[in-house]
Amino acid sequence: MNKTKFLNLKELVIVLLLACVETAIALVTAMPFAANLQLVYFLAHGLAGLINGIIYVLLVKKCPKIGTQFIIPMIYGLYFLFTGSVYVFAFFAILAVVNELIMLGGGYQSKIRPAIPHALTWMLNAMGSTLTMLLFRDSLVQSYVAMGMDAASADAAIASLEGFWLAPQNIAIALAAAAALSIAGYALGMKMLGKHFKPAGVA
């Protein structure tokens, strides 16, 4: 494969920096909603996708090469790894590969296809806790026990959370909101690309 299809050192630095900015924005966006579980689930992740859509468009227009789509979710996933959420990191590592595969074969020449990895990233972000409870419930119970809870109390605590995180209607709302706002963010970024980024020579 032609070497120009891969990120060079300068582009790698740009992607790493902007991916870190996306992660920081996601964390800051969630802070005002931290006390309200419903707003975190239904709104915070979509808002992060909306705001980060502008940065994402700039990123993929400046660095439309193999490696870009892998790095974006991996950086976000590493945050979860460092904070002890190993399973969520694993989800984002898988998504990093999926997003990269989606963009192979001329994906960056399309105006539509780049929106898919962006939407998937923030949809997965909305589903992090849901998937962890669904797939690794026993491990969660054991983590509560390790913190000093007895097994019955730990199981009851997880069960109380499952009623919210695993409710089908809540999952549907969270996914729809994250997808819609992320796509809106991408569309806003594309609009700004023509009006501001290109005239300014940024992209």
Kindly give the residue locations of the regions a language model identified:
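Hydrophobic transmembrane alpha-helices
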Residues: N2-I71
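Short, charged juxtamembrane terminal tails flanking transmembrane helices
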Residues: M1-T4, M190-A203
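Interfacial aromatic-anchored transmembrane helix boundaries in multi-pass membrane proteins
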Residues: A30, A34, I75-M103
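Membrane-embedded alpha-helical hairpins and interfacial helices in multi-pass inner-membrane proteins
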Residues: H118-G194
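Hydrophobic alpha-helical transmembrane segments
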Residues: L12-L17, G46-L47, Q69-M74, F89-A90, ...
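Short helix-perturbing small/polar motifs within transmembrane alpha-helices
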Residues: F92-T130, Y186
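Membrane interface segments of multi-pass transport proteins and intramembrane proteases
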Residues: F33-Y41, M103-I112, G194-G201
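Alpha-helical transmembrane segments of multipass membrane proteins
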Residues: L18-T29, A48, N52, Y56, ...
